[in-house]
Amino acid sequence: MANSFSWKTKFKSIIIVDGELFANEYSIKLFITPYTANLKEQTEYFDRLKNLFEMVFANTITTWRDDPLYHILQKSSSNRFIELPKPPYDQIMAAVCFCKANAILDSNITVNKLELSSWQGDGITYSVDKDSKELILLDTPNWFSKKYESFDPWWLRADTATYDRELDKGIYTGHFSWNNKIPVDKKHETHAKIFEFNPKVLDGGKNKNK
């Protein structure tokens, strides 16, 4: 039987609530089981998990997709965003983090449970596992247009996207890359293709064509 362990981390993200910006910090505890016997792979995927929270999610603006201020900031700033299908309550954030963490790990490591609390969250800790009802809140029919309706929302994909955007060449797949052979490219959005992109590099990548 695989050995399980837990890991704690934090990241800061500004949240948009009712058209206002609020500083926030999320505290996360993950309960993890590795399923690959290859220690190098375990290390690579754990690095990927660490970078998801400490780099990809960090220093972002977290928002509901339909918030008017989000659309203004998209056009007038160069911030990175975490785009949610509902307003940014901690239950939604916990469910999104749980799904994205498992998506990027390719079943080599499994996050069995995730606990999340936040500075703005009144001291409440939310727990999410595969049977949690919070996951139903992420059900998003018509998230993409008909052209791209076969694609999952960003929190169910293994790329580094934290919001979704349809581009002429395909869907946006993230500011970072798991593939450590891909060079840094500051013009990431103009080069984004469907599961093929040239963004900033993170540890934990494997040589896979996605």
List the model feature ranges, each with a label.
Residues 2-3, 7-8, 12:
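Fungi-biased regulatory scaffold/adaptor regions
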Residues 10-99, 178-210:
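Histidine-centered catalytic/metal-coordination loop motif
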